[in-house]
Amino acid sequence: MTDTLSGTVDRITYFNQENGYTVLQLAPDQAMVPGLSKGGLATVVGSLPEVAPGEHLALEGRWTTHSKYGTQFAVEVCKPSVPVTPDGLKRYLGSGLIEGIGPQFAERIADHFGEDTLQVLEDQPERLTEIPGIGPKRSRGIQRAWEEQRGVKEIMLFLHEHGISTNLAVKIYKTYGEEALTMVRGNPYQLERDIYGVGFKTADRIARDLGLPTDHPSRIEAGIIYALEEDLGEGHTYSPPGSLLDRAVELLDCSPALIEEGLARLIKEDRIRVDRVPLPGDTPDGEVSPEQIDAVYLTPFYHAETGAASLLRELAGALPSRLSDIPPAFLEELHPPGEDAVALSDDQKAAAHTALTHPVSVLTGGPGTGKTTCLRYLISILEGSSKRIALASPTGRAAKHLSTATGQPASTVHRLLGYSPQEGFQHDREDPLEIDILIVDEASMLDLPLTYNLLKALAPGTHLLLVGDVDQLPSVGPGNVLGDVIASGAAPVTRLQSIFRQAAGSEIITNAHRINRGEMPVFPVRDPGAERQPDFYLFPAEDAAAAADWIVDLVTRRIPEQFGLDPREDIQVLAPMYRGPAGVDALNDRLQAALNPARKGFPEKALFGNTYRPGDKVMQLENDYTKEVFNGDIGTLREIEETGQILTVEFDGRLVKYEWSEADTLTLAYAVSVHKAQGAEFPAVVLPAVTQHYIMLRRNLLYTAVTRAQRLCVLAGNRRAVAIAVNNHQEAQRCSALDWRLKSS
């Protein structure tokens, strides 16, 4: 329930110019207001437009109790109004908010003009020269400052009246400045394109409030773009025309003819492209479907798909290459001398030989099949030939793992390409990477746009080796790059299948391969007296609620006690869905309450649907290249700074600061989705396996979850749900034409 409070600003205790966070003392209009100071003032905190003493505020929000500062009113909506009393006017004008007016001039102006003061400032500012000491120049400066402050307040008030939170209103004003009101009134759908956190539905609500017709061209076009972006969010690079039309009609509640007209306008503006591609999905014999459709692309993704296909074909055909001069003796040895040298298997030798002799190649295989060993030997050969090597992965976690496994420096693809938010990618066709070979690990996580930018940075003659497990989930972003490259035959592929002896003793690895073959995993029974304990378990639970109870007990008590693992640092809960008792959201709430409960005297802050406390496990939800944190990075919340409205999060030993208005890019991470865990490994993984998650019970999802575990994997659920997942090999079909474009060269 929302609380209300109104009153006159007595003084400003703190104001952050960047994000609008304010701490002020308010003289309330109401009686019986909680937590008043001895002077009868209430403490108000939150993101506000710049306000001044004497100003009247109508506030909506919640009363909260701070461990250090006591009772406070946390603002969600603020509606300021200029004071009308003589004393209020003097304090307001003399607060410093209006440049050129200090306390003395404020008193003179209010005394001279009396009740007409506001009218003079609004309509007759030239009359300010009637005040001794105010000449024409100062009068014009005061007029400009007054109009600027009035504009800011109009913008904030307008946004609040249309349901925009103060945090989001601050973002909008910081983006557009004084043009914010004009822009929002003229085309509220522009907000969806420019402001993170404003979606089509929010923009549409504002447009309806403004009286914009439901058949307005801007609305139709924004709805079509939104429908295309929804498909991108599901991994598709394009939308089939029929499904796009149906969803747009349903979303916009309009006739198909209006959608067709909107599509034509978007094509003319080059915001979308239409291209003939085969019907998604292969024929029963594995060939490309002869039937074609008009695929609708957002223009950047059309360029990414066609460009990636063209560049990959060019790279694959560039011979002789920068590795063509490696002596044949190195190719015959295929492993370095030394005490620790282990002979490669025939498949590993084939993979290394292929990587050295083909400009583009793929190495794939499940856990324990020797991909890392193969890479170490390959790198040794390259170093012995004085070749320039670069190693990269799509995420920071995967890059760190690659560096540890190979003993070589590795970076994210974005860092390798010199990405910055302001200038984009430094390395491209005009400034390619000065390397002889690039090895990309966890290549199943490469989405289409990143692949396109990566290929642009590789000069012909450079070798590219894509390494990954094609049987895992595809990338979170649009496309199915690794799968499409393999399916196209555009590059030779080596699949490692033999499990090496040291890996064969792990139930995690052997069960992962069973799952991938469509076989039920084996659940061993723990024998306390045995020398070696199993690393794979099932705790029986018939429904999601019982599974959630097991998970909380496993994470907080059983696993720490029996395996000596830290519940926050070492154990990661993965779930296939967000909703339900055993979904990500509910598990986060329960695990936070168990591992990091609210404590008297310790700070906490509710932001964007989560309550945060120091010590919380949190995850970054989108790439932020300025902060150098990336989608899926997991860290620990170290500090909540009330005065500056700052959250400090530690990622891999590095402290990163977030303004509270940026906290929508964070979430709790005691439990995360399986998709978000791609590219990461954890000492222990705990996951629910219940039939309530039926829609998400798929083989590749279970396989991906199990292969995230290094030392321990525990399922809470039932064999029936596991069997459903193991037997469900129906992967969600992604609309992508990359494999066809590669085949049709």
Predicted regions and their residues:
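Conserved helicase motor core of P-loop NTPases
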Residues: V470-K627
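Conserved RecA-like ASCE ATPase "motif II neighborhood" in helicase/translocase motors
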Residues: V413-P460, V672-H675, Y703
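ASCE P-loop NTPase motor cores of helicases and related translocases
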Residues: P280-L438, P492-R501, I508-D543, K600
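Accessory, non-ATPase domains that flank or precede helicase/AAA+ motor cores in DNA-metabolism machines
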Residues: M1-D325, H335
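C-terminal accessory regions
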Residues: R517, D633-S745
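Conserved ATPase-coupling elements of RecA-like P-loop NTPase cores
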Residues: A443-L454, V470-N480, L697
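The Walker A (P-loop) glycine that initiates the GxxxxGKT/S ATP-binding motif of P-loop NTPases
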Residues: L97, E130, G365, S393, ...
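Loop/turn-to-beta-strand initiation segments
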Residues: R388, E434-L438, G461-L465, L712-C713
